[in-house]
């Protein structure tokens, strides 16, 4: 799977990751250009040992984006859903990279840029 994308809606990305986990064959992921936001989770979800990045690829991780509006109760519901999405992203990153949940939480707390060198890249 070749990736060059700024991400997208987390629910759409989760559907891709679910399908990657469903198929019985290995899934090779190759990053080039820009792989950002939730798309970096797709990169990390490739089969271990079959995740690659081109030399000048920009890989960026961040919190799932979203906003809240409406009544106080609606804002609380939306904020809880955003928190759930963040925990899902942390879990995916932790399970695919072997990093602790705390390390992944810190990595996702703000925009984090990863280099393409395999030993330095969390997603490799």
Give the role of each language-model region:
Residues 67-124:
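Charged, glycine-interspersed solvent-exposed loop segments at helix/strand-loop junctions
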């Amino acid at each position: 799977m070749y990736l060059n994308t700024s991400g997208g809606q987390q629910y759409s990305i989760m559907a891709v990751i679910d399908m990657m986990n469903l198929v019985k064959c290995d899934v090779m992921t190759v990053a080039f250009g820009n792989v950002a936001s939730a798309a970096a989770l797709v990169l990390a979800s490739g089969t271990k040992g079959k995740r690659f990045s081109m030399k000048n690829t920009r890989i960026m991780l961040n919190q799932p984006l979203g906003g809240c509006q409406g009544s106080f109760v609606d804002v609380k519901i939306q904020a809880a859903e955003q928190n759930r999405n963040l925990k899902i992203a942390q879990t995916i990153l932790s399970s695919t990279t072997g990093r602790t949940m705390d390390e992944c939480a810190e990595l996702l707390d703000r925009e984090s840029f990863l280099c393409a060198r395999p030993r330095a890249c969390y997603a490799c």
